[in-house]
Amino acid sequence: MTNKNTSTDMRKNAPKGDNPGQPEPLSGSKKVKNRNHTRQKHNSSHDM
């Protein structure tokens, strides 16, 4: 229950900037998203 709330709170707090540790995890998430995007692009090329 607390874990679920923390995830939502983190996301809500991220834009708020209340916690200094929030931007750190956000950056990590962005890196993962970017990595996924690159993989998709590569996959598209392979599919072609």
From Swiss-Prot:
Region (Disordered): 1-48
Claim: Cytoplasm is one of the keywords in the record: no
GO terms (BP aspect): asexual sporulation; sporulation resulting in formation of a cellular spore
InterPro entries in the cross-refs: SASP_SspP
Stretches with biased composition (Basic residues): 30-48
Subcellular locations according to the entry: Spore core
Induction and repression of expression: Expressed only in the forespore compartment of sporulating cells.
Domain of life: Bacteria
Keywords: Sporulation
Principal cellular location given in the protein's record: other
Family: Belongs to the SspP family.
Protein name: Small, acid-soluble spore protein P
Species the sequence originates in: Geobacillus sp. (strain WCH70)
